[in-house]
């Protein structure tokens, strides 16, 4: 080890326990919020608590600081916690005024609510903080050993009685005594050293405008850092592969390389280079290319606890550089953290990340990649290595002596190569250390883009740019203060990234928000201003100055709003995104595709190396030779969770292939030095294509898991634009794109090639791997291990991260780490809509043109984005997706686009093909419509064009020319692979996950049911589509045995349809793990199977793109790369943490609220407003995470969906014939009737909608794919009582289970397994959602189900045990009478974090303030006494019913002194409103949507008295015809709700008419009107309408108090009437705007029942006996809002005493006759003056008259 020189030693001694190896020049200035490092940060980074000496020092410094802030404002608002106790830049203790990180109140003194903040209170908090810091991360068995003095001090500081705590002076004296030999300042400064540098690095990595020059380091001459054990294989250079093969740069002569090689800095001052690999840092969960580009800053910032490696215990401030190999020096931290976020972090799987050393070489992503032979680089980038060079990520490599400096990837997404430095004995000439020039840039600035375009952006391009910029802005944690055309970069896939502003510091004030000129804080709206300026400049580019900018009004208005001078007047980024998104959505455009098309259209690549081009639609391929043999397989490195160590594992390194074999297999031209840089043209050989049987055979072998040397004689060419690799015999030959274009992320990869008429074939897997497991793709040097999952290319870009469906190791542009044997499959990605298409007239490739590279499981469309499932069980041809443009195997779409271009391409219209593409896709989506509807849809959509009838006929024939296969052909096709090159309708294409939402309106999503429907015959002509609907019959057609023989098992030959990309992934996840039905995690493992109300209301749009993106992000964080299940630990942990954050924030908010009431301080008010916003934000995050959890649960159920063509099996599967089923209403022929129309014109489209069905058919449809996802199951559970009883439904489900139970366990992949599993899911969803309304009131139902589960299911399938638990919990909950807020999801969980969030909100508010509320106040005397009426309190007893139960029920409350209506005046409007709301909410939470159905049969009528008297309700309901089946016993809870509403209305009227003075009546009228106003403003429409009903009583309206009521108060009555009209106007008026998701709501039960009665009017059945599902679906949507409103409870603090009194008063007047009560009160009449009183007045007048005389 080289010793330190004296100067360095002195430096370290002076600096304390600083980083051991490097001393940096002054770090950049930190933002204000990061100048302080908190104690929590330090503890997290050290991963251990404070030592005793440190505790004494911190205690002393805190005490001194506390004394200095005694008169500051922070003294009153401070709560000392590990988060608020911080150290400033000088190491001094300071306090931060931020939200207390106190989940359990451990740091809050017990007397806080009484005394507020005092010295004693702060001493308590300080003691608790020090105690927690000392015990931080202590082993459970190892208690921290503290001295007796420190223990005693901390104990006294935390004494319950403030008087027992030591005073500040005594604490200071004791601490100074203990620190006589040590400086407390020095200890604190040393303590904060690690956090100081980390935060500085964090801030620096996040600040894009910091120049590189300020990031210089001065390495110490020696290395004194910690070392690995000598035998540690992870650090031993001998076990590392020694790459050989590629020639060194110097041997080739000087030339410009497409990549910027990573060259070491010149040797300075005797510094030596190390040959060790780059140190790794443990990063947070895996991040992808899409996230890195879209959210570079936030993703690049290291987080506190989970981010940093555990530092050595003997050196708390140990360096963050942990060596992987033994050497003499380590890399400086500055080389690990790049100033620019785009090149900062190379995230790895399992959180392991490596960074490229970059002394003076910046790793900009604009550099052109060098493509290589035999290795797939990340994101299309590679180093100059031979095929045998190990390129696996996480594998340090050293340079060969003759190789020269090793090259490093030039993009943050390239994690394939480790940073390398020359060995000590290899000195590189100074000239060789200069950077090589980049041949092209992957990112293009807007300035360059506009310059090369030579024109301003068009309208739709501006909209797309605006949306992309705003999305990029919204995802950044720190908002850019300055944007210009040079700082906005556009990637090849259309992503937008903001780069730092110009280094020269020149700024154009035009792009700077006005408030920033005043040096205010950079806000989001300041950045919105910058975006508007950029867009304005782009729109006016090359337009003469004297010309007015001509923009459409809508766009111009948006830009002007975004550029308003006043920041508050500008729209937020979210609001502007909504406007832009709606514009593009209406036109079926994708912003990323538009920008990608622009980017591709101007991209001129200056290719320095000559390339090998493939003729006829193949991409240009660039290859490099390797003359040296490959080394033997070396141990690979696997990341170990959160530890920075690397563990060597035996076996070949993933992504490494035998090179010698490969070299002998390649043509000589590929390896010849003479021809390496000469173009080689390979003529396309039609014989390369394989026929279907061969593909099928290879597929079956592939499923076996091993493919050894199959087809070695064939050369497979991979023409993916971003896959520069040539694999072993059947590995693909990569190509960078036309003219050596830069590799593009998947999804934009066909842009350049297709723009030149050359669509790209898909990528191909390496030969030594099962092709189903992995696929060579851009940035995928890591093939997956053998697995049955398919490798699925995916659209990639910043706006859309890689979906978790991408197979492990396959198509991962970011190559986030070495794959392991544990990689699970991923769900299929969405097919991207590429902006490029083939040129008009270009003929698509036929089947014979398929290269060998397109293996068996390749899609028929020859496009990289096409999913390539290796397991043919996942390849059901009925699965649909949107059509992809530019496909070679989609002639219908190409021909339609060609016809459009020929007809309308004139005067520059349709010049770039984008408009024609969009129009073609839209028209292609209309293929299943009748000709008349087809013509009308086109003419209406594109009304600005003249559509000739002949053109429409041609288009109709083109799009309908290839009909869907019949069921028989579908079965045959299902057993084949999707590699067939025959044209196929979009019904055979995979659905998109994102098209489950509301995106991409022009992408038609044809029905997955179409290929299986009886009408879809292969030879049917277009006239067959003229029918408006079709019918699917479920009559018994064959025996079960015959059914099984003829119809392939759905689990084996089919893939779930209709948006089933996630379903498929979950299915593959289970299969890849070898989980059969007996071992498969049942629905219990997923906690819930109920789709929820939002499924019934929003149907397919329930889960938006944000949910899908989050699930994808979550999937990438899985250790095996698999889609997370519903019990994802990451999701559960995040949800738990968000709930805890909400709880502690709410507690803190409540404390501040109480403090504000006492002190009325302005500081507290400011804090309250901030906290309120944070609470709303936290609540929305929790709701979002809950929605994600629900999505995963729904996708579990979707694993078992069947195609409609297999639904007859469900009906005929029972051992007994269908007609023997004793379903009284179900013995007619069962069928389903669909409409042949488009369902979602604005998003995913569906050619067939279920219109009607017989009861048995509707129940069978529960088993169809997407039934859960599209809301059918939830809608069925709400409405099935109209056509069958719970007994019938249970019989149906149990019969399916009984018939499939045995067979499902015999064959885990069969259709029977799906039926069995889906039956359990539906049964669980029913029990979870409708237990209270169906099971208790239907005798024998519960017992039958329990007996069946115990006797039939549990012996064979133990996973069904949870169903019994649900039934038991349901009975317990019913007995307890708990409201819906505590649902059945987690019945036995007692933890707070497992409680439903809304119940948490409610209980937290109850616990928060009610326990600490002030003592009960006696009523204030306000002069309103009743002297004349005290003797006769009430003479109206005859008019009131006697509530005999009151005294027994309420106890002392009923005996309190009667103050009558006067008591109401003692309470504020808010108090009364909140308690009335809580009372109403308590009743509403117990109701169920089913309670509102069939209300007419209960006697609910549309009249003032909505509910009949109790005595007559039975007779009325008996007379009314019930819409339910006769033997269904209906729950009458709705009557209880309406009766309570009537009681409240009666109480309101009675309180007013029983008032004995007009003044009291005016007071009460005003009080009730203001309460009602508060109610409807807070969306408590139930109480508002009840009060309105009481005030509209005739006796109340005749009261003279109305005449003297203030005008402003009287106006409230008119507002209430307007609200009533609004509520009556529409049944879904309260669900508009989605604001209700964030606001509690209580609907008027009577008005909601009336709306449902209106929907129930009319017939439910058709002439053939089928029930109208469209009618039932509408009813289900309306009643679903009951559950929607129950999910958002009010969080007012309950006042039990006031509630008790209100209940008492309401019960007292229940059923009273208001007219009788009014007649007894003189205040209700106009008083006539008595004769005596009149005489007195006359006398006074007479005396006054005498005075004037």
UniProtKB/Swiss-Prot annotation:
InterPro entries, per database record: Kinase-like_dom_sf (IPR011009), KIND_dom (IPR011019), KNDC1 (IPR029899), Ras-like_Gua-exchang_fac_N (IPR000651), Ras_GEF_dom_sf (IPR023578), RASGEF_cat_dom (IPR001895), RASGEF_cat_dom_sf (IPR036964)
Biased composition (Low complexity) is annotated at 739-748, 766-779, 980-990
Q: Which SUPFAM superfamilies match?
A: Protein kinase-like (PK-like), Ras GEF
Q: Where in the cell is it found?
A: Cell projection, Dendrite; Perikaryon
Q: Which residues carry this modification: Phosphoserine?
A: 964
Q: Where is the composition biased (Basic residues)?
A: 823-833
> Could you tell me which residue ranges the N-terminal Ras-GEF domain spans?
1246-1371
Stretches of Basic and acidic residues bias are at 363-373, 410-430, 702-717, 853-871, 1040-1056
Q: Which domain of life is it from?
A: Eukaryota
* Coiled-coil region list: 1133-1190
Q: Which cysteines are joined by disulfide bonds?
A: none
| UniProt GO cellular component terms | dendrite; guanyl-nucleotide exchange factor complex; neuronal cell body; perikaryon
Query: Residue ranges of the KIND domain?
Result: 37-217, 444-608
Question: Which SMART domains would you find in this protein's record?
Answer: KIND (SM00750), RasGEF (SM00147), RasGEFN (SM00229)
Q: Which residues form the Ras-GEF domain?
A: 1468-1719
**GO terms of molecular function:** guanyl-nucleotide exchange factor activity
Q: Where are stretches of biased composition, namely Polar residues?
A: 1005-1019
In terms of Pfam families, this protein maps to: KIND (PF16474), RasGEF (PF00617), RasGEF_N (PF00618)
State the protein's purpose: RAS-Guanine nucleotide exchange factor (GEF) that controls the negative regulation of neuronal dendrite growth by mediating a signaling pathway linking RAS and MAP2. May be involved in cellular senescence.
* Alphabetical list of PANTHER family matching this protein: KINASE NON-CATALYTIC C-LOBE DOMAIN-CONTAINING PROTEIN 1 (PTHR21560:SF0), VERY KIND PROTEIN (PTHR21560)
User: What assembly does the database describe for this protein?
Assistant: Interacts (via KIND2) with MAP2; the interaction enhances MAP2 phosphorylation and localizes KNDC1 to dendrites.
What protein does this entry describe?
Kinase non-catalytic C-lobe domain-containing protein 1
